[in-house]
């Protein structure tokens, strides 16, 4: 018993002397390594959350923490837990430099279900898709209505802009067609579909390096809590897999690709501050 008391006393003394060293720093690097998963609105107002993020003070904000919101798109409302997936992911990235502190938020479920295009084609790459030109602007409008326009950040994203239907896809498996080298462009965005690396940590079905764009690293949410990607729904990613297929996450959690006209889930991300 005396030995246990002595050990406890030693540990308590060490903690007292070094608690500053043992505490979690308030920066992005430290907070991208800790998952919690609570409703932030039970502790803070949204104004307080936003003020902390804009100041780069991520104290008591952790991966998996969320803000419940209801978005209305094309007359249909859907409630999601908009979850912190990464702190300062886009910092110093883009055709124009990103210098503002932010968090990436992703919904806990799909907002709705729709094809990337009206037919099974990937012509024009991600930029040329109906999802890019029509659906993402609708989502952005709904986000600004729900969160407030000043809290939905614009960011510069590198996206694919064309597809060569005759080249071999880097996805393998006999797939034909893909995004040619240098077939990309910088686009100013307010929300977008995630890339394969943002979800899986690497490419699986993406046809070329141009499908990766700015989303080149895995989001901390999916690294720390892989079940966050497995929501028992099919949901689209931005990568071109072939001349007729885009990448997606399967309802069983597998990486997959399928015809662009299929009505799969829309699960975008945006930068919140």
Describe the function of each predicted region.
Residues 1-23:
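Short, low-complexity N-terminal tether/leader segments at secretion or assembly junctions of large
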Residues 22-273:
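Collagenous Gly-X-Y triple-helix signature in extracellular proteins
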């Amino acid at each position: 018993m005396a030995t246990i008391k002595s050990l406890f006393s030693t540990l308590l003394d060490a903690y007292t002397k070094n608690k500053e060293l043992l505490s979690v720093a308030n920066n992005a690097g430290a907070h991208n390594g800790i998952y919690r998963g609570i409703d932030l609105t039970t502790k803070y107002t949204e104004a307080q959350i936003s003020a902390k993020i804009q100041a780069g003070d991520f104290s008591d904000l952790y991966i998996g923490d969320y803000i419940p919101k209801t978005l209305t798109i094309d007359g249909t409302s859907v409630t999601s837990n908009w979850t912190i997936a990464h702190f300062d992911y886009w910092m110093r990235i883009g055709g124009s430099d990103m210098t503002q502190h932010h968090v990436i938020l992703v919904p806990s479920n799909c907002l709705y279900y729709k094809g990337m295009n009206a037919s099974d084609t990937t012509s024009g790459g991600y930029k040329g898709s109906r999802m890019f030109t029509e659906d993402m602007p609708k989502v952005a409008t709904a986000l600004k209505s729900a969160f407030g326009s000043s809290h939905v950040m614009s960011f510069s994203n590198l996206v694919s802009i064309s597809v060569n239907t005759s080249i071999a896809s880097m996805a393998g498996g006999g797939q034909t067609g893909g995004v040619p080298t240098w077939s990309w462009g910088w686009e100013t965005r307010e929300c977008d579909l995630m890339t394969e690396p943002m979800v899986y940590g690497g490419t699986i079905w993406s046809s070329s390096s141009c499908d990766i764009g700015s989303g080149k690293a895995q989001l901390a949410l999916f690294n720390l809590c892989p079940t966050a990607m497995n929501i028992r729904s099919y949901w689209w990613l931005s990568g071109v897999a072939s001349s007729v297929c885009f990448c997606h996450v399967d309802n069983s959690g597998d990486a997959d690709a399928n015809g662009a006209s299929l009505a799969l889930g829309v699960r975008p991300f945006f930068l919140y501050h």
